[in-house]
Amino acid sequence: VLILAITCDRNVVFVRQYRHGVGEILLELPGGGFNSMEEDSLQAAARELEEETGYVSDHMVSLATLYDNPVKDTNTIHLIMAEQAQPSGIQNLDITEEVEIVLVPIDEIMRKIEQGEICVSGTIAALFLGLKFLS
């Protein structure tokens, strides 16, 4: 799951973290996998949002399900939008995770994409779908 969390004051909740595959620190939306076969995408999104960022939302909606990279695997990404996200103060990272929380005003999103500050494909897809949904 990948979560587009938007706060009441119209900031998007991002995480900044090192990604070994590209050897860079990237600005991306929070996300993660399913804990069990019984967990659905909205439950996984709620759990991952709070674990990675300490934010919670009671207003979640599925935006789309996309193939991650159909050339090499069968992974899918469930894009979830979480409106009215609020900090709960309870971040629960895995022992190997180092995550910085970054709030970006919605009005700055396009500029950050155009300038290459946001360059992860799933994050960009969720942003475009979510911002279209909001307009």
PLM features: what roles do these ranges have?
Residues 1-47, 93-95:
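Conserved Nudix-box catalytic region and its N-terminal flanking loop in Nudix hydrolases
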Residues 12, 24, 74-79, 99:
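Structural motif
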